[in-house]
Each structure stands twice: as C-alpha cells, then as structure tokens.
C-alpha cells in the first residue's frame, strides 16, 4: 500500500542519491512512524521510477488508477499485482513476498538489522533506535547496492 499512494513529487531523481519519500498523505496513512522514510532508488527500482514518471503524464499521482485526492485503493492494486504474479511467477509468489525477499537479501550481505529496518520501514524494539534522524541516504544506498 505504501507505493500505491505515492505522488510524482515523492520521487526525487534530481538529488545526489535518487530516492523516494514515503510519508503520510490525506488519501493514505502509514502503519508506523518508522514507515515514514526515504528509500534510495537503485538498479531496477531507479529504472522503474524513471519509467513511471515518463509514462504517467497528467496529474500528481504515480498510480491514478488506484489513488485520488480522497482515497488510495491499495487492496485493488495488490489484487491486480497478485493476479499478474500468479500468471508470471512460481506458485506462492505474492506482492508481499518482495518485502520478505528484501529482508533476506539484506541479511545475506550482512547488513546491520537496524539499517534493514530503516530501509524496509519496520519498527525496531529498541527505544534508542527512535533517537536522532536515522541513517543518511548514502548509508542506505551503500547497503542496497550490495544486493
């Protein structure tokens, strides 16, 4: 549901490190405070973000079929993606599998768990993790480039 509610303005390609900003909007909230974050765009995610901006001319929304000023229909978007995945991937692969895969791939390169949580927007159990501004994009990007 996070991506479905994105505005084109939430995709930042003109900074030193291309990234997207996940933040609450009136049409889509986020689950936790940790869900609000900047996520570096690298490799295929950067390609997809550029393609999304190029192919989606009018209006402010990245996915206008599923989002408007009043609501974000993440369930319909998820159902459509899961249908496509059933037809094009191995059995059992669903859209949520990508979050599990991200965590597994970051673990495989020995990424520290607090950085994994920062990238994925997962909350941590440590009170100390909520202090400060979090990791800079350079650090997050360094780990994402390893996967």
Region spans (language model):
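Conserved tyrosine-mediated DNA breakage-rejoining catalytic core shared by Y-recombinases
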Residues: 1, 5-50
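C-terminal catalytic core of tyrosine-transesterase DNA break-rejoin enzymes
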Residues: 1-2, 76, 80, 97-123
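Active-site/catalytic core of tyrosine-dependent DNA strand-transfer enzymes
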Residues: 25-26, 42-91
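Catalytic-site neighborhood detector that most strongly recognizes the C-terminal catalytic loop/helix
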Residues: 26, 46, 68-69, 113, ...
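Residue-level marker of regulatory loop/turn positions in helix-turn-helix DNA-binding domains and
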Residues: 33, 95-96
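Short, solvent-exposed beta-strand edge segments and adjacent coil->beta transition regions
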Residues: 34-36, 60, 128
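Extended, non-catalytic subsegments within catalytic or DNA/protein-binding/adaptor domains
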Residues: 35, 55-57, 142, 147
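Bulky hydrophobic/aromatic "packing anchor" residues in well-ordered structure
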Residues: 62-63, 103, 131
